[in-house]
């Protein structure tokens, strides 16, 4: 039986661990490294599928937990699965809901069977197990789905993380057995282990032995420093087979994307570009710009003079500032379009730099222009 997801390595950068490749899915082939915009509720906030396609997005992420709670996976399935339900014809990846259960849910109780918790919307008692998570994802119908895992806090004790990793491996095996559609949906295993190298190695060894079509690196970008995250990536990406995609979950600041690629990561997702857009914060080729600041009231230039997105081709900082200040939804639509375009096209430039074997030089120039080399620089 052919797997639903296949990875093809095209080239490795001569000076780093960066990989140029492509992932073949039932809804098209997309190049890697890639950034995936997040559509938590089956929509990337403030953006239409047509706008996403126009700016070059090839795959988006949706959230299993939120769609299970509302409207329910049965309704999405009845609507033809996520692709048809939201009218998106390209790739979709769903997480397993585990991260939300462990970060949002109140009064949770973790057992070997799964997690009992209260729904944060109405207080109802709910239960999510590896089998239930896979059933929901099968019904939602994404191209790529995640195993149910526990995401322990980065600074949790060694003993706690050890038990958590062992349980996550057992849950991964149960999820693999429960998976009904391996020929149309690729299931990834999630490597955990917080900052402990031996536990990350154990987690990777367990999951690689199960031969998933791809592997995610979880439990990062949860409050640890950039140096800590890069330290963990330095050894973790090497544990994943070369012929499988490597996905770093929940990472989306420009510096972290480039530094992740340098260490061999292929896929990234984050709510960052749309979340910061809603308060008027924009990523530009010259660094972070808060368009609602008073100094832009009479600035009739685009957000970024080097950007070809719909927003920068058509609207000025002064106009967008006016929209944000008056709480007009069109303003946050314009900033969202710009930020998502910025990250999608940053990855396009990164892919070209790998092709040209000059990713380190690209990083140096980008960091200088963006302002990462200044003291007290923001990370987005």
Curated annotation (Swiss-Prot):
Record text on cofactor binding: Binds 1 zinc ion per subunit.
Enzyme class: transferase
Subunit relationships: Homodimer. Within each dimer, one monomer is responsible for RNA recognition and catalysis, while the other monomer binds to the replacement base PreQ1.
Name by which UniProt lists this protein: Queuine tRNA-ribosyltransferase
E.C. no: 2.4.2.29
Binding, Zn(2+): 307, 309, 312, 338
Catalytic activity: 7-aminomethyl-7-carbaguanine + guanosine(34) in tRNA = 7-aminomethyl-7-carbaguanosine(34) in tRNA + guanine
UniProt pathway annotation: tRNA modification; tRNA-queuosine biosynthesis
PANTHER family tied to this protein: QUEUINE TRNA-RIBOSYLTRANSFERASE
Sequence similarity: Belongs to the queuine tRNA-ribosyltransferase family.
GO molecular function, one term: metal ion binding
Region (RNA binding): 250-256, 274-278
Sorted UniProt keywords: Glycosyltransferase, Metal-binding, Queuosine biosynthesis, Transferase, tRNA processing, Zinc
Gene designation per UniProt: tgt
Protein task: Catalyzes the base-exchange of a guanine (G) residue with the queuine precursor 7-aminomethyl-7-deazaguanine (PreQ1) at position 34 (anticodon wobble position) in tRNAs with GU(N) anticodons (tRNA-Asp, -Asn, -His and -Tyr). Catalysis occurs through a double-displacement mechanism. The nucleophile active site attacks the C1' of nucleotide 34 to detach the guanine base from the RNA, forming a covalent enzyme-RNA intermediate. The proton acceptor active site deprotonates the incoming PreQ1, allowing a nucleophilic attack on the C1' of the ribose to form the product.
GO CC terms of this entry: cytosol
Cofactor(s) the record lists: Zn(2+)
Metal-binding in keyword set: yes
Active site residues per record: 95 (proton acceptor), 269 (nucleophile)
Source organism (scientific name): Pediococcus pentosaceus (strain ATCC 25745 / CCUG 21536 / LMG 10740 / 183-1w)
Listed NCBIfam families: Q_tRNA_tgt, tgt_general
Any one biological process term the GO annotation gives: tRNA-guanine transglycosylation
Positions contributing to substrate binding: 95-99, 149, 192, 219
Entry keyword Metal-binding: yes
InterPro entries from the UniProt entry: ArchSynthase1/Queuine_TRR, TGT, TGT-like_sf, tRNA_ribo_trans-like
Gene3D superfamilies reported for this sequence: Queuine tRNA-ribosyltransferase-like
């Amino acid at each position: 039986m052919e797997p639903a997801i296949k990875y093809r390595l095209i080239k490795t950068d001569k000076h780093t661990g960066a990989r140029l490749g492509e992932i073949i899915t039932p809804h098209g082939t997309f190049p890697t490294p890639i950034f995936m915009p997040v559509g938590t509720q089956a929509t990337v906030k403030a953006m239409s599928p047509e706008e996403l396609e126009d700016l070059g997005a090839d795959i988006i992420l949706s959230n299993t937990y939120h769609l299970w709670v509302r409207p329910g996976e049965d309704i999405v399935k009845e609507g033809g699965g996520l692709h048809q339900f939201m009218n998106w014809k390209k790739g979709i990846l769903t997480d397993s809901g585990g991260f939300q259960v462990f970060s949002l849910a109140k009064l949770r109780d973790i057992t070997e069977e799964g997690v009992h918790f209260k729904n944060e919307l109405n207080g109802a008692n709910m239960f999510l197990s590896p089998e239930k998570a896979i059933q929901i994802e099968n019904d939602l119908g994404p191209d790529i789905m995640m195993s149910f895992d526990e995401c322990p806090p980065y600074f949790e004790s060694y003993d706690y993380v050890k038990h958590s990793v062992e349980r996550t491996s057992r849950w991964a095996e149960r999820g693999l057995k429960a998976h009904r559609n391996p020929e149309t949906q690729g299931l990834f295993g999630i490597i955990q282990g917080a900052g402990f190298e031996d536990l990350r190695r154990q987690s990777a060894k367990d999951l690689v032995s199960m031969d998933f079509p791809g592997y995610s690196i979880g439990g990062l970008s949860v409050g640890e420093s950039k140096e800590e995250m890069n330290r963990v990536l330095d050894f973790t990406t090497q544990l994943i087979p070369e012929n499988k995609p490597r996905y770093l979950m929940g990472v989306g600041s420009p510096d972290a994307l480039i530094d992740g690629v340098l260490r061999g990561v292929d896929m990234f997702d984050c709510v960052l570009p749309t979340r910061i857009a809603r308060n008027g914060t924009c990523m530009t080729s010259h660094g972070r710009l808060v368009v609602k600041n008073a100094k832009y009231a009479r600035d009739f230039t685009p957000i970024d003079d080097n950007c070809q997105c719909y927003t920068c081709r058509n609207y000025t900082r002064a106009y967008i500032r006016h929209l944000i200040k008056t709480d007009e939804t069109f303003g946050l639509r314009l900033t969202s379009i710009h930020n998502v375009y910025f990250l999608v096209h940053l990855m396009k430039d990164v892919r070209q730099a790998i092709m040209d074997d000059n990713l380190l030089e690209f990083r140096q120039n980008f960091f200088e222009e963006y302002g990462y080399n200044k003291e007290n620089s923001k990370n987005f």
